[in-house]
């Protein structure tokens, strides 16, 4: 089993977001995580959110505790502040679930 989230983002700076992904991936792997799917979206046909979305991905961890530890990791938070905050305008949490 694993714990998975489907996330929609509105990315405003592709280059900086790519730097964020490159910098955070080793920390993600250390916490037993990874990306299962990753899409660049040009048209949203239906959304329950009023936030724009141009990127959708599935991120997974071995369990929910690993996810929580990753998102509170000091090294990750530093990378998030440096790259994510200025490259992403909106985050939509579409779903979170245990995958069997």
Task: Give a label for each model feature.
Residues 1-72, 96-100:
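Short S/T/G/P-rich N-terminal loop/turn motif that feeds into the first structured element of a domain
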Residues 85-100:
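C-terminal end-helix/capping segment
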């Amino acid at each position: 089993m694993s714990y998975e989230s489907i996330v929609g983002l509105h990315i405003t700076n592709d280059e900086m977001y790519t730097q964020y992904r490159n910098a955070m991936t080793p920390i993600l792997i250390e916490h037993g995580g990874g990306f299962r799917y990753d899409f660049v979206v040009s048209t949203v046909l239906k959304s329950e959110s009023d936030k724009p979305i141009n990127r959708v991905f599935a991120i997974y961890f071995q369990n929910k505790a690993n996810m929580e530890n990753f998102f509170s990791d000091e090294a990750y938070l530093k990378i998030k502040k440096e790259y994510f905050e200025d490259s992403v305008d909106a985050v939509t949490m579409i779903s979170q679930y245990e995958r069997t």
